[in-house]
Amino acid sequence: MTAPAPKLLQPITVGPLELKNRIMFPPLTTGYEERDGSIGERSLAFYERLARGGVSYIVIGDVAPVMTASPTPKLATDAQIPTFKALADAVHKHGAKIALQLFHPEYDVPGVGRMVMGSMAAAKAAQEAKAAGDEETFAAKMAESNEIRNQAYAKLHHDMQHFVNEASVEQLTQIKEAIAASAARAQQAGIDAIEVHGDRLVGSLCSAILNQRTDEYGGSFENRVRYALEVVAAIKEAAPQLMVEYKLPVIMENPDGTPRGKGGLQPDEACEFAKLLEGAGIDMIQVAQANHTGNMGDTIPPMGAMPYNWTLPVAERVKALVSVPVATVGRVVSVEAGEKILEDGVADIIAYGRSLMCDPDIALKAATGEPIRECLNCNKGCVDAIQNRKYISCVLNAENGDEATIAIKPGEGDKKIAVVGGGIAGLEAARVAAKRGYDVTVYEASDHLGGQIVLAAAPPRKDEIMRSVEYYEKILPGLGVKVELNHAATAEDLNAADAAIVAVGAHDVVIPVPGADSDKVVSSWDVLAGKVELTGRVAVIGGGLVGTETAEYLLQHGCEVAIVEMLDKIAAGESETILPLIMSDFAEHNVEQHVKTRLTAITDEGVEAICTTEDGAEEPVKIACDYVVMAVGSKANAFDLDGVTVPVTCVGDCSGERTADIASAIRTAYHAANEL
């Protein structure tokens, strides 16, 4: 248990609203809404779960005031009002307040929409022709559909860079009116607040980097922020009963001092703008990172990319200049961090975004002192999903995204459960089984918990992943779970329980080529575990997640590295927000990348391989090296079930579903324990 967090739990008045605590869920694009942008069961369940967990203020991200093809919520017609009213009612039941973040995309929505509809119409005509046996018309209409679609994509790509400068004053006025109309609908639906999305189109107009206009909306600082202030005024006029918040995107600095983001204001201008916003009647300001770079990781950075609470210095400056509440967001991963920010008086409200996806009960646990499940900032299930237009989920929270259908069930009588293996899957199985009221014992053959997570935490920037293990070490004793280290479970141990969950993980494998038994060949797992120390030039066989991370680890320890990968690119499964960091590291250290290359032999001089060229030819490749590191995947471990008489379920890497995948480990363990 940790100390309760009294500052986080203090109420605060924001405009016309009384928030019961200082914990906020900031806007995130979830992908949970219906195809037309209205609120469906998945959205409703997700946001109500946050409210039930004690969050005081929830912002629905990227709500469009017009109908677009983008997978975001939309409040563009009166017909959508009832679904938003249902959302407001669900959140209000738990004492939370709810806001809509209104935004407009940075493109000509009607123009792109007409092109998309034209493409769909041509495709429909093609299918009708095909059904009638008219192959000539079918081919012509399909070609027409594809051509229009390609033109739509080209226009979209162009507009994302240039619409801010090409939009007419008339178009900007129409967009402003659409935003105001959406705010009026929100008020009618019982929504409590509107957050102006200060990034996207509005932020692009504010930006001295992106805004090259020469009219009243371009040039000087006053002109660049003019439209944003007009949007604020339009919202306040259309929905006078609502609290109005402004998300203030700021172009921060990377650790190397270079600018981070484009679609916002520099810190000095942001501070000046904050004063103008207060004068315009804004009730609250959320200081955030500017975006518009094409990489979501710039706005929502992965572990190790930016310091914790990295936007806080600007939030502190803004708070000193305005009298309205100021929220801070950005890698606030613990209750203690949020409490410290409030104690220091540098912000008034703490926005826990990814953290609340990971643990929606942060507010409740802040009151009791129960440890929270801290977000890893891995970005695998959430930010990558946003980038790829999929619905988001948290790798550590098997319920996330399916709150309507998944929850821990009450136990069925008194049961003893044996869990074999203290890796992440075994620990999650133990947690869920114990939450159901069962008597749980974890048997771990080694002297520590964590399994492969310990290896995953070794590469640069990845040490934060150990928070996943530390969480279980904190909570399992309080749940009554017994952990026996240095204990290889036996059939007798399992038979003493009513059921067993086996989570014995996987082992790494070696490609059986000539020379694979050489002393110069080592396992990537042994490298990451610190069992071997390599020097000189190293060839890493396998350019997947483990291979690339091992390569970075070796670079950090002074080695020269070459990577041999059979696929056409390395790090195929890595987070898209982390991949640029890896590639930058490789470029800085001149890492050789041999893709579409198959290992054939290991010799005293190095490795021999075959590379498939672009034209399909095969060419021999020789890479000189002092050591060869095998990082070619893993294979599920087997547990000897001879003599075991109780029901057994395998989870995690040994389940056969997918190895070296934390989301799979958590999911299989959760569901197995929930069905005992």
Spans of model-derived segments:
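Flavin-dependent oxidoreductase catalytic cores
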Residues: 1-420, 424, 428-435, 439-440, ...
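A generic local structural motif
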Residues: 10-12, 44-45, 271-272, 313-315, ...
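Hydrophobic, well-ordered secondary-structure elements that form the walls
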Residues: 285, 318, 341, 353, ...
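Short, structured coil segments at secondary-structure junctions
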Residues: 322, 345-346, 479, 517, ...
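Conserved beta-strand termini and adjacent loop/short-helix elements that scaffold enzyme active sites
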Residues: 329, 397, 486-488, 524, ...
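Rossmann-like dinucleotide/flavin-binding elements
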Residues: 411-445, 484-492, 496, 503-520, ...
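Rossmann-like dinucleotide-binding cores of NAD(P)H-dependent redox enzymes
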Residues: 439-479, 551-599, 655-658
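Short polybasic amphipathic segments
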Residues: 606-610
